[in-house]
């Protein structure tokens, strides 16, 4: 939003402009009574395409509603030279000359007054309002969630024929047609569409497309995809537009040959991140990628690297953003740890097998343990001012809301190409506290103690999706397990969705593991 104000509002501020603006806020934005809500639901459709969504805006000069996403309100502004419009969801004023939402003290005062009037007509409970809602009103005020009146409750009871969201509801479960070796894409789409915060973002129509051609925007297509998944339809969806856009924006994935699901995940997040730039709310980002787009809010964490000089023990620290954590496995050519007694390793038909039990926690311990860099990798120490041997240790500086663990099952080198089939046991609930940089610093200072419940909870995760690969490096197939509601699991094999048990999930090989934070704090 432009902080300096806008001179173009003067053309609107003519006789009775405040009254006209009040009518728009009362009838089509804040809607404080059942009558105005009915009027808004009936009247607020795009006058060009008839859509209810797509960020409807109302012209301030005439009676016209148009889609912001599809640029219909832009066409009206250009043809009629009506340069101001109001966002019917949040109440912000947009200037087509400035190409930005603008601030005007007088207009904001009208908006606040009409919003307060609307509150008085509703049952308002501050406890029901989340800080997230507080940041999205557009005028810096809170608003309440809908509370049905006694009459509305009676109407709901007398009209039972409606779709109910229950614990056994299958809304959100939908197969995907394999378009020719596209199982790598289908399994990632299943994981993303069942990521709770990502689902809430797209189903609330929060994306603000700023691309010249929305048809080339991957975020717009993902928004459509979420609408398809949660529409209640059960027939398999054909993701041909998604595949086309992926090929367009990630050329290395184009073609019908087999691709890697992990590579697709990172490419998809990268393109979504780039196409989400218009969704940044302008607030200071609280993640290492310094971006407030929905992708970085959910998936970005901070990895701390501490390099310690072996002579002066000086520490050089860097923090890098990450979207996933790639973990080495026993049986790879990368040194891991001595095999436990009774374990054995071998290679059969190009696949590496290791007997014995390895856990996800073991892999994380290995990932965060100090590593001696050796004489061939000396670095210049800022304390000694000379090249010295050092040790390097990785820890988690900031955890993402969704943590994705990539088990490195495919090994490619000049001499070797193989798949590692080592079984890795992974839990339904994961505590990342031992792998935090703060835990390491406490131990080094001799102050380590059992973390408090609140700190402990901040680092707790629950499993919600697993991607698996069956077959060999040369020929294989991807499937996924996804969690629906609290404890229902389903196996997604392209177009086929079947119910699965928790045992099925935990006994699977595991290639990509998706965990969601159990407790979230609004920032």
Swiss-Prot record:
Reaction(s) this enzyme catalyzes, per UniProt: Thiol-dependent hydrolysis of ester, thioester, amide, peptide and isopeptide bonds formed by the C-terminal Gly of ubiquitin (a 76-residue protein attached to proteins as an intracellular targeting signal)
Compartment(s): Nucleus
Keywords: Activator, Cell cycle, Chromatin regulator, Hydrolase, Metal-binding, Nucleus, Protease, Thiol protease, Transcription, Transcription regulation, Ubl conjugation pathway, Zinc, Zinc-finger
UniProt cross-references to Pfam families, sorted A to Z: UCH (PF00443), zf-UBP (PF02148)
Zinc finger motifs (UBP-type), residue ranges: 4-121
UniProt KW GTP-binding keyword: no
Residue positions binding Zn(2+) 3: 59, 62, 76, 82
Active site: 183 (nucleophile), 477 (proton acceptor)
Keyword Transcription in annotation: yes
GO molecular function: cysteine-type deubiquitinase activity; zinc ion binding
Residue ranges of domain USP in the record: 174-518
Subunit structure: Component of some SAGA transcription coactivator-HAT complexes.
Record's protein name: Ubiquitin carboxyl-terminal hydrolase 22-A
